[in-house]
Every structure is written in C-alpha cells, then in structure tokens.
A protein has these predicted regions:
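Charged/polar, solvent-exposed surface patches and flexible loops
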Residues: 10, 14, 57, 129, ...
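Mg2+/Mn2+-dependent nuclease catalytic core
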Residues: 36-61
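Nucleic-acid nuclease catalytic cores
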Residues: 56-111
C-alpha cells in the first residue's frame, strides 16, 4: 500500500464511523482503496492481477482467512474471519489525488470488470461518477 492509499484508508475509516454506516445499506464491507495521481486511473497498473477476482468472490461465495496471516502488519483482534456473500459487500474506493479534492467513489468490482471487458483501459472521474454506487466526501 502506498502512502496516499494509506491516507485514504484512514480518512475512509473516519468517514465510516461518522457517516458511512448511516448512508450505506446494512452490510459488512470489504474495501480496496485506490488513488489516481492523474486524470486517468489505469486498470493494468492500478490493480494487481488477483484483486478484482478476489473482490468479486466476496460478493458471490463464502470466504475465509486466518488473521494470523496478518500478524506482521498489526495486532490482531481475533483469529479468523468468515464472510457470507449475503451479508458482505466488496467495493473499490477510488479517489483522484489533487489539491482540495475530498470526493471518493465506491464502485462494485463487477462494474469495473464490465468496463474493462468493453476494452476500456483507464477510468476517468466522469466515468467513475456513472458507475459508482456511492459518491462521498471525506
């Protein structure tokens, strides 16, 4: 995770506690945070090969992982996590980095996959507005 993605995660966490849980449907959310430094968010360099398929899997089948896999990153609060596609929603949060911009877009990974399948190589902020399920301010 790059520094700006880490900053976006921190801001999204604050947004979730103050606003997000009130405006989004009741669910557990898995969020992949992405930032773009230019007008275009390039899909090939912006996503690792496994990220979109994994996020889509959260929306379609039960998932599990051992928290001990994350021991090197931070203190763990429990040992395992299980998700159910009925109660879990995976989303991509994208923010374009520029002075004063506080807007972020929550987009379903399936929508991004559909855009890629149409031959689009990069996402503009205008396109993000069209496919986002939620547009928020940090």
């Amino acid at each position: 995770m790059v520094k700006k993605e880490a900053e976006l995660c921190s801001k999204l966490n604050k947004w979730w506690i103050t606003t997000g849980y009130k405006v989004l449907p009741v669910s557990n959310y898995c969020i992949e945070a992405k930032v773009s430094y230019t007008r275009l968010f390039n899909f090939k360099s912006g996503f690792k090969e496994h990220q979109l398929p994994t996020l889509e899997a959260y929306n379609t089948k039960p998932m599990k992982w051992k928290i001990s896999d994350l021991d090197q990153i931070s203190t763990k609060h429990y040992d395992m996590s299980w998700t159910n596609p009925v109660t879990t929603k995976a989303l991509v949060a994208i923010q374009w980095v520029r002075r004063g911009n506080k807007t972020f877009y929550l987009i379903e990974p399936e929508a991004i996959t559909n855009v890629i399948a149409q031959g689009v190589k990069s996402l503009t902020e205008e396109c993000a507005k069209l496919i986002a399920i939620y547009i928020g301010q940090l």
